[in-house]
């Protein structure tokens, strides 16, 4: 690949990284899972290096069904609300993923859409009250929410 093309690809990757925001939905691989998963960016650090994300599942896992504190943190999304969904699905706000934001700038992750303002607010509220994030992490990922 030519140096000019490599530079152009790097610039596009940086542009994509600069535009990622809470509510953005990506489809990509997940370690240990045999199919692609939908990820929702729930919060982004002020320096745009770190992010907090959650998964969309096609059904609620039996493990979660037996745990009321986790079950109450599942947000139902209807397929008629989002073009990227083919059936009713559930946002798992009981198990946040913390990673580098550039995780989603990888070419293996495809942008699929964005949650409505109401749904991203619900996701963020569920995460903030989940007990899965420290106060420092809440302040880092959700400074404009608190």
Q: For the regions a protein language model found, what residue spans apply to each?
A:
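Mixed-charge, Lys/Arg-rich low-complexity intrinsically disordered regions
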Residues: 1-19
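Short, functionally important structural connectors and interaction interfaces within domains
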Residues: 12, 67-69, 107, 125
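C-terminal terminal-subdomain/extension
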Residues: 74-146
